[in-house]
Design a protein with these regions (language model features):
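Bacterial N-terminal signal peptides that target proteins for export
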Residues: 1-8
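General marker for long, soluble alpha-helical cores
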Residues: 5, 18-263
Length: 263
């Protein structure tokens, strides 16, 4: 091998090693403490996870979610009635597996948790163009059941600006192709990820849009978000029209709400 060839090989090996180490870092197992209690509705459990060993990463925040009982294996609410019982509760999803193991005391299961990411899931996501899939993010994917089929459906629907971070918000606020298609049916182009999240956060729904349109308005998506933020509802518009204010633009209606001119 020539000297130049040896240098090139060394560089390639170093690059490969660096990529491998970064991948291993992202796929590290997370550990910490956990607890499970019954939620008030009787169909869910309150799960709390608090990571350990993260002092050097600046990300020691705890996570608390309400999980459907069907999400668990090895656990039921009846276990919380057995004082001193040992429980191994697991949540398995495409992104990985969370295991919370511990004992029951006073209706509460407390112990230690591990989260093990699934390398095959990460490989698929990389192939689909998603990066920065660190273990903490994959843990959230597991808790919110973010899977390949759902992600692919968003891509197929033409949702722009998707990344590994905003997928979590899209999932939390129940953005799916049914919602996207309902907007398309009203003549709106498919919004990007950020706007879809904003629409869902503000509870913009097709039925209310139809009511607003029936009153002579053709709101943009941004205007729909503003209308929800400032409570410019069909009822509010009717009240303004009853006062003889029939030619108010959406912008004027929003200003009336902002400055409380209708009171």
């Amino acid at each position: 091998m020539t000297k130049t060839g040896g240098v090139v090989l060394s560089v390639l090996l170093a690059a490969f090693t660096g990529l491998f180490l970064r991948a291993e870092e992202k796929l590290r197992t997370l550990t910490g403490s956990c607890s499970i209690t019954a939620s008030s509705n009787g169909t869910e459990a309150d799960l709390r996870l608090e990571r350990s060993g993260c002092e050097d990463r600046g990300n020691c925040s705890s996570t608390q979610t309400q999980e459907q009982l069907s999400a668990f294996s090895g656990f039921s609410l009846a276990d919380l009635q057995h004082e001193g019982a040992h429980v191994d509760a697991r949540i398995r999803a495409e992104a990985g597996t969370i295991t919370c193991s511990g004992g029951v005391h006073d209706g509460r299961m407390s112990g230690a948790f591990t989260f093990v990411p699934d390398p095959a899931f990460v490989d698929r996501m990389l192939q689909m163009g998603f990066h920065d899939l660190e273990a903490e993010k994959l843990e959230a994917y597991t808790l919110f059941d973010i899977g390949i089929a759902w992600v692919h459906s968003l891509q197929a629907a033409g949702v722009g600006s998707l990344d590994s971070g905003n997928l979590i918000a899209l999932r939390i606020f129940h953005v799916d192709t049914d919602y996207i298609h309902s907007l398309n049916a009203l003549g709106y182009a498919t919004p990007d990820a950020g706007k879809l999240t904003a629409l869902r956060v503000q509870h913009v729904n097709p039925e209310e849009v139809k009511q607003v349109r029936a009153m002579g308005y053709q709101p943009t998506l941004d205007e729909l978000i503003q209308m929800r933020i400032f409570k410019v509802t069909p009822d509010f518009i009717h009240r303004m029209q009853a006062r003889g204010l029939n030619d108010l633009t959406i912008s004027k209606l929003v200003q009336i709400r902002i400055f409380q001119l209708a009171d």
